[in-house]
Amino acid sequence: MATMLKVSLVLSLLGFLVIAVVTPSAANPFRKSVVLGGKSGVPNIRTNREIQQLGRYCVEQFNQQAQNEQGNIGSIAKTDTAISNPLQFSRVVSAQKQVVAGLKYYLRIEVTQPNGSTRMFDSVVVIQPWLHSKQLLGFTPVVSPVY
């Protein structure tokens, strides 16, 4: 009878430990901190070909949109340097992704401007692989803080 009680107690404790390790909680050291719908970092950005190609796509789309907007203004705008010398993609320097109705990427991209200087831009792009869709949502220059 005492042996049966010990076995029952050991099995109960073992079951409790298994549940404690498997159940996600803030106290669980094995749990990865992920917030549903939250942003997560993208590892190995420099060597990640998909992310670098996505950055190049963002710059190309921005250049195309700028060219289309300038072309709609009139013949004077067609001599603008933004059209004859568009931004050149250099590299993606940081990236985060978020699961939405697809994947939303937040990229910080280094570009070379027509005058040869480099500048950072933040871009947002959504990919929906099942629709074969990729859409640039935003492409804005990073403003350096003035101290």
From Swiss-Prot:
GO MF term (any one): cysteine-type endopeptidase inhibitor activity
Metal-binding keyword on record: no
Keywords on record: Glycoprotein, Plant defense, Protease inhibitor, Secreted, Signal, Thiol protease inhibitor
Sites marked Reactive site: G37
Domain Cystatin: 87-117
Cellular component terms per the entry's GO annotation: extracellular region
Function text: Specific inhibitor of cysteine proteinases. Probably involved in the regulation of endogenous processes and in defense against pests and pathogens.
Family, as annotated: Belongs to the cystatin family. Phytocystatin subfamily.
Name by which UniProt lists this protein: Cysteine proteinase inhibitor 2
Species annotation: Arabidopsis thaliana (Mouse-ear cress)
Gene name of this polypeptide: CYS2
